[in-house]
Structure formats: structure tokens, C-alpha cells
């Protein structure tokens, strides 16, 4: 495998260059703006392209060293691509709602994950049948709530080594927690956002469904490339694996790697977004 390639045409077709209405701009993004058209800021893709390449390189290197990537995107149009991309490369995601303290209070979050796993086990082995209807319904409600909030990180086993964010305005709490802990941040930053706190900026549209799908796909493929490098370093003969089994090998290794890791401390359109 190799670091994913992408063209300027792909960025254009996905609408990556469309920013927000000019009156909503954040001056901190001025250097990445090419101009405006019909009252909409246009991002400079000659800057976006190499900055996205750099972000992919960082993702690959992080995973190649055995690091964990946390995908973060809780806005409606980001939820499915974020989850799909993370699962495809055996990484982790938060796509429902960022819970305060997810990173900075990991011990408490770990307890909630343990609770989710406990309920899942009881559901699977039929233990819930011995409870009253009220108790069973209470557990089922807890299970649904915990799965939505923590299902994407239930096997993470510790703090991530890097987070990838869609929409820095919406996910400002996640970025603040990452910065407090010294966790690098890769993020798509639109014209109405501040790049402060982002280590690897990807200037781009953070609302269009096609743009979000493109970012997530590229990040996922970069992570897969990093995992392939990790497997090769571990002596796995990737050439001997059947087509498609690299991803399976990665998925099988991920939970084991998480267990071995030391415990950590505590319908958007493909056009500029309308006013909220």
C-alpha cells in the first residue's frame, strides 16, 4: 500500500474550495482565502493540497508507530463518514456528541465503557431475563445511550495519539482537551473558523457531504498504509495475504494492541453552508 494520492480536480469536484459567506469569515483564515464569488469566500486549493498531504503523512506515521487515531465529527453530515472511515482502518471515533472530559477525565470514561461492555455481556448471555421489566428497560436505555456516546471508542484502551476533526467550531471542546494533554490535532478548518489549537490545518469546506467523505476516505487510507507498515515491521508477509485480508489483519490486531497499551491517566449540499 502507499500514501493515498488525490488531485486538485478531486478537491474541486468535492467542493473543498467553497467557504462561507464573506461576512462570516474569521480573519485568522485570511491567508488561505483565494478570493470571493457571489458573496462566498473561495479557499486557495494550491495551499490546501500540500497541507492535506502533510496531514496524511502525519496520520500514516502515527499509526505506523502503533499510535491510535480518534476521528471526531458530530455534525449530522459527518456522523456516518466519520464512523465508516474509522472502522475501515481499525481506528476510533466520536460521532454522536462530545462528552466533556472524554480525554481529560479518561478514567471516568473508561468506567462508563466498562459499564457498556457489562450490559452487552448480560444481554448476550441472557442474564437480563432474570430482572424485572423495569430493571431490564433501564439497562436497555443505558445500553442505547452508552453505545451512541462511547461505541466508537469502546476498544480504544487509552488516550489517542492524534485526533482528526471535522468542524473546529463545533468540536472546540475536543480540541481544547487534546491541547491540554499535548495530543496533536489534524483538522479541516473552514473560512468561518479559527485555526488556533490545530497542529495540522486542512483549509477546506467542512459542510459539504462530498468534501467530508473525501477527507475521511483519505485519512482512513493513510491510516491503513501506516498499519501496513506496522505489520511489515512486525514481520507479517503482506504479499502472502489474500486481497482484502490486510484490513482484517489490522482489525484483529487493534484490540490486542489496545489491551497491551499502558493505562492512561486521568442534507448538507455540496455548496457553501446556509446561515444557521
From Swiss-Prot:
Which segments show compositional bias classed as Low complexity? 252-276
PANTHER family recorded: 30S RIBOSOMAL PROTEIN S2 PROKARYOTIC AND ORGANELLAR (PTHR12534), SMALL RIBOSOMAL SUBUNIT PROTEIN US2M (PTHR12534:SF0)
Q: List the InterPro entries.
A: Ribosomal_uS2, Ribosomal_uS2_bac/mit/plastid, Ribosomal_uS2_CS, Ribosomal_uS2_flav_dom_sf
Give the originating organism.
Jannaschia sp. (strain CCS1)
What is this protein's name? Answer: Small ribosomal subunit protein uS2
Q: Which NCBIfam families match?
A: rpsB_bact
Residue ranges, annotated region (Disordered): 251-276
Q: State the UniProt keywords alphabetically.
A: Ribonucleoprotein, Ribosomal protein
Tell me the name of the encoding gene.
rpsB
Amino acid at each position: 500500500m502507499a500514501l493515498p494520492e488525490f488531485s486538485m480536480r478531486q478537491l474541486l469536484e468535492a467542493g473543498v474550495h467553497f467557504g462561507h459567506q464573506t461576512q462570516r469569515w474569521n480573519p485568522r483564515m485570511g491567508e488561505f482565502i483565494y478570493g470571493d464569488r457571489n458573496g462566498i469566500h473561495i479557499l486557495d486549493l494550491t495551499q490546501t493540497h500540500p497541507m492535506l498531504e502533510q496531514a496524511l503523512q502525519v496520520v500514516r506515521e502515527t499509526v505506523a508507530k502503533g499510535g491510535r487515531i480518534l476521528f471526531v465529527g458530530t455534525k449530522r453530515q459527518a456522523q456516518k463518514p466519520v464512523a465508516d472511515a474509522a472502522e475501515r482502518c481499525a481506528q476510533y471515533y466520536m460521532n454522536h456528541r462530545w462528552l466533556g472530559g472524554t480525554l481529560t477525565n479518561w478514567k471516568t470514561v473508561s468506567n462508563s465503557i466498562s459499564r457498556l461492555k457489562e450490559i452487552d455481556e448480560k444481554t448476550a448471555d441472557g442474564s437480563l431475563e432474570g430482572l424485572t421489566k423495569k430493571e431490564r428497560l433501564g439497562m436497555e436505555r443505558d445500553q442505547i445511550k452508552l453505545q451512541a456516546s462511547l461505541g466508537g471508542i469502546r476498544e480504544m484502551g487509552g488516550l489517542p495519539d492524534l485526533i482528526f476533526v471535522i468542524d473546529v467550531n463545533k468540536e472546540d471542546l475536543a480540541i481544547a482537551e487534546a491541547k491540554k494533554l499535548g495530543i496533536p490535532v489534524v483538522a479541516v478548518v473552514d473560512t468561518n473558523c479559527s485555526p488556533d489549537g490545530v497542529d495540522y490545518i486542512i483549509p477546506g469546506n467542512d459542510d459539504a457531504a462530498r468534501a467530508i467523505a473525501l477527507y475521511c476516505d483519505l485519512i482512513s487510507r493513510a491510516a491503513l498504509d501506516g498499519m501496513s507498515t506496522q505489520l511489515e515491521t512486525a514481520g507479517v508477509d503482506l504479499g502472502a495475504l489474500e486481497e482484502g485480508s490486510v484490513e482484517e489483519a489490522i482489525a484483529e490486531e487493534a484490540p490486542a494492541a489496545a489491551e497491551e497499551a499502558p493505562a492512561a491517566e486521568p442534507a448538507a449540499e455540496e455548496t457553501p453552508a446556509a446561515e444557521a
